[in-house]
Amino acid sequence: MGLSVDLARKTVTVSPATLLAGAFRRIGFDRGEGFERLWIGQAVHRRVLGEFLEGVPGYETERAVRFSFDVDDFTAVLEGRLDGRFEDGERVVVDEIKSLHFAEDLGRLAGSPRLVRFETQLRWYLLAVARAEGREVAGRLVLADIETGATRIQSVAFDPAAVLADLTERVRWLLAEFHAAHALSEAKRAEARTLPFPFEDYRPGQLAMAAEVARAAATGAHLLVEAPTGIGKTVAALHPLLVDALSRGRKLYVLTAKTTQQEMFVRTLDAIDGESFRSVRLRAKERMCANDVVLCHEDHCRFAKDYAAKMESSGLVERLLDTRRHLDPDDVFEEARREEVCPFEVSLELAERADVVVGDYNYVFDPVVSLSGARDPAALGEALLLVDEAHNLVDRGRGYYSPELSDAELSGLEERIGSFLARAAWDAAEAVRRVRRLVADAAALLPAEGPEAADLVPLDARRLDDLRHDLEALLVRHLADLRAGADRIPDDPVLDLYFTFARFHDVARMAQPPGGERPDPAFDVVAIRAPSGSRLLLLCKDPSRPLGAVLNAAAATVEMSATLSPPEFYRDLLGLSRDRTDVLRLPSPFPRENRAVFVAADVDTSYAARTRDVPRLAAIVAEVAAACPGNVLALFPSYRFLDDVRARLPALPGRRVLRPSDRSTELERTSTLGTLRDGGSPVLLLAVSGGAFAEGVDYPGEMLSAVVVVSPALPQVRFEQERMRQYFEERFEKGFEYAYVVPGMTRVVQSAGRLIRSESDTGVVVLACKRFLREPYRRYLPADWYGDDPSELLSASVGDDTAAFFARTGR
């Protein structure tokens, strides 16, 4: 529920959690309620309540309480739920249950902020019950040990007048914060009315797009925008959404798949001339960690130690918000390190206060790392989501909910644990072996013949639950070891083991809910045997349920890309409500004569014919390169296919041939792009469709003159892809298209989009495969590539046609 203020009625409704959050800053593990959020902590909590329900007559749990009191000229209402309640003669006893690790925490609890927090919350509940029922009350703080299950009960003293005074003061502080925020919101609302578009003129199509985006925000719609590269989608979406967010007091999340796209949005935000709004760009925790080891606990990190006190005394968040309009991660890192506080936690606090949050998809859609505001439907209801390059979100969402247990990776963890000298090492090694046995038992169900196999297997939910419980007990002991002085090491194998299994277990309970509910048909449990080792995979064929839960909770969303066809595919697999979803398709704003598209239909790149046609494909690439005055990008469906064609390329006098490594580093990618830019002899760059040189990268000016796309780039046929095909056939009657053609042709169109980025760019796109002119592939070729029919793209000689195009355009 959080905080709700009605200025007209002079009422404020608040939850204990909101009051506590305003008074107690927490970090890392404790930010998420620590042990209480662990599976083992919840189990202990349930067990303690179960014992009380069984052993204490009339014991009640989760009873709602509501308490009204005056705060100046406001009526305040505190709403919450009691962990436990029972009657002892004439008095009412209220229980508050908290999970701890007795061996480490109990001795340090007395006088700690943690105990103050526990007791404060309980006293508020005591006051609420006393006022509501007019009876004597007593409070018990029930501490439960997550390792042994033991409990310790502490009586909590209760002075009604003192508690009411404390509660009143805390609400008064929250109201002051609210009034300050409200005044700032009024200033933002006023500025929004005149917030200028950051450029002198709209490009063709931009004004129409901006108007549709504004309408979607105003009406609460989901808007799927398919617009070609170069139209200026970034500012056409960002400006109207920012105006709406400032006008209505909403938060705007700008979500991208790559950091280069984030930089583009930040530059656009900087160009928008406004003083009242604040934006922050988030960076991954590992890259924002100032400690030598990523371990977010005050006992192991000086930047986490005394975090609350240092933040309070430094006023860092307020100072950053007062002095910077956009909060860059580099600046946040340096300022936080100077105050010796955790830079990542500071960025999270800034994100809570900022009007615009720019970051990776993970911060809203990944169930493990998403921001707290993205997990709360009420908070999402006051948020706008802008999803850039939204064609990537289906696969990314599928990845969030397709965890796997890999024997090869588990074996590596076991080796690292073997060299780790903490007391918990033996237990950790045994835990890894148990998880490996889980994978081995699943793989044993596969047919014995052959080095490779994959099939559906059953999942033992009880076995997974037991493993989760024991792994969390191990985690508790391991953290105690570290606290006692055990060596901390980078990439802690015990933490890696726990979080790997925890994600798998969480998704398993989603796929096969406890309590006898029907398994979700969108998920499969797959055992895989391969030369690299066995794997147990939870395959999310359709991520629409979890993604839709987030997107549909938002006030409005815009999903944009150069490739969102067919729109019903993205609507359905993103889980967007049909009655809220609109589609906007915009044509290219650039002259059609600036680009030529040719199809070389005399080759067949299907798997069966691929080897036969490799020599002809090499000739096609060479012909285009010879006819082209500038750099050429040739894209292949795989590195193996690329190398087969490369081996058959004839000599190309005066042209450099580059083939980046399969897993090129950022430094190598930057160097390669620099070579394209250096003005020397032209380059033939060989890369793969869907890779770093095919998507999310710009080739401005004359960096690129032609793109050759070899094959429709369909996903590889394998067991998992075939399971998706069967699922899509059953649900949509479009199995092959949804599992293979749409992903492949999306890559093709994305690759071609690298070529024309402005009205002065010219170039040639060559599609090498006869399938491009056959159904269903031809259906996914953009309409602005041809006049009346895709057959117009057929070329008898792509080399001659390419040379003729550049002769005509004067390049």
Walk through the language-model features, giving the residues of each.
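A contiguous, basic/glycine-rich beta-loop/short-helix subdomain that forms a polymer-engagement track
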Residues: 332-352, 357, 368-375, 478-604, ...
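A substrate-engagement module of RecA-like helicase motors
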Residues: 185-192, 196, 246-357, 362-365, ...
